[in-house]
Amino acid sequence: LKNWIDQLQSWWTNIVGQVSLRDSSLPLIQESYTSQERVYQLKVGQKADAKSLVNLQETAYSPSEIWPESLLEREMSTKSNSLYLLLLYQDYPVAFIGAWIKGDNCHVSNLVVRPGYQRQGLGQFLLNQVEQVALNQNCHYYSLEVRESNHKAQKLYHKQGFETVGVKKEYYSNNREDGLAMVKQLILKD
């Protein structure tokens, strides 16, 4: 019976394509992170945080790469299968990650760390937090795309266990740069 229920739940999730990441039972992994004597607070992103996320993107991306505030608001307020986590230092947003779950895959849509706060483990911390959510949601895969020219990010993702599985030709529309598809297989605990 349990096997049948699991199959039905998996089938339903694939049909609907959503699991609730706003459920009060969603365990929020860690509430803070310490690096170089700084204590960062972890916060689940809400619609009101969209402007802060746009500002963060502006520090790291070219204007044509920035997700609009309206899209981020919609992602955080209406899509129950999306999750945004922010890291704050003294109430100042310094990093965020966006992800969504569909079926057995957790996909990172966005990871930004403000220059000046990079290379302090913040990106790695956020990736680990989303991975724990993915494991709690019984995901088998953790995926993302990265610019072919972004060697620093690729190094981080490889360090985290992601493998390059393909090239998406001209994936980034602003300059037609190829994107590398990367996947990490997740091992579910019994």
Question: What kind of feature is each model-predicted range?
Answer:
Residues L1-T34, K184-I187:
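Acyl-donor-binding surface of acyltransferase catalytic domains
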Residues N3-I5, S35-Y40, V44-G116, L127-Q129, ...:
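Acetyl-CoA-dependent GNAT
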Residues I66, Q120-G121, R176:
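Non-catalytic, surface-exposed connector residues within folded enzymatic/regulatory domains
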Residues L72, S149, Y172:
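Positions that flank functional sites
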Residues S82, E177-A181:
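Short hydrophobic/aromatic beta-strand or adjacent loop that forms the aromatic wall/cage
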Residues R114-N128, Q137, Y141, E148-K155, ...:
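Conserved glycine-rich acetyl-CoA-binding loop
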Residues E145, H158, E163-D178:
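Conserved catalytic-core motifs of GNAT/GCN5-like acyltransferases
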